[in-house]
UniProtKB/Swiss-Prot annotation:
InterPro entries recorded: Chaperonin_GroES, Chaperonin_GroES_sf, GroES-like_sf
Gene Ontology molecular function, alphabetical: ATP binding; protein folding chaperone
Source organism (scientific name): Mycoplasma pneumoniae (strain ATCC 29342 / M129 / Subtype 1) (Mycoplasmoides pneumoniae)
Alphabetized Gene3D superfamilies for the sequence: GroES chaperonin (2.30.33.40)
Alphabetic keyword roster: Chaperone, Cytoplasm
HAMAP family assigned: CH10
Protein name: Co-chaperonin GroES
Location relative to the cell: Cytoplasm
Cellular component GO terms held in the UniProt record: cytoplasm
Length: 116
């Protein structure tokens, strides 16, 4: 991934819902069109912006890190797709909640740092 978020923006890969439905006879079928409200507002953190938000002087302090799951407002950010994966870039202001997944890195990307 060559995209690095700036300011207090966050790059997330969207988490798709794997919702299943069970028929009266016990047959499990995956829904062709999962409920948008259950899948479109959740993502895994891929990268964190390192700069301050517009009009602010302090760099953001994230309570979550790369690899954690965040929940965000429905119409926040911009969406795009790369190599079959759906991504979204959102502002820290639009994050509503998060789930920690073990020992994740919560620091920001350092200015001028080279990505592998």
């Amino acid at each position: 991934m060559k995209i690095t978020p700036i300011h207090d923006n966050i790059l997330v890969s969207l988490v798709e819902s794997n919702k299943e439905e069970v028929s009266q006879k016990g047959i499990i079928t995956a829904l062709a069109n999962p409920d948008k409200n259950e899948s479109a507002h959740k993502g895994t953190v891929v990268a964190l912006g390192a700069g301050p938000a517009y009009g602010k002087s302090e760099k953001p302090k994230y309570a979550f890190g790369i690899g954690d799951t965040i929940y965000f407002k429905e119409y926040s950010g911009i969406s795009f797709e790369e190599e079959g994966t759906k991504y979204k870039i959102i502002s820290l202001e639009d994050v509503l909640a998060f789930e920690k997944h073990g020992n994740t890195k919560t620091t920001t990307v350092k200015k001028g740092a080279k990505k592998k």
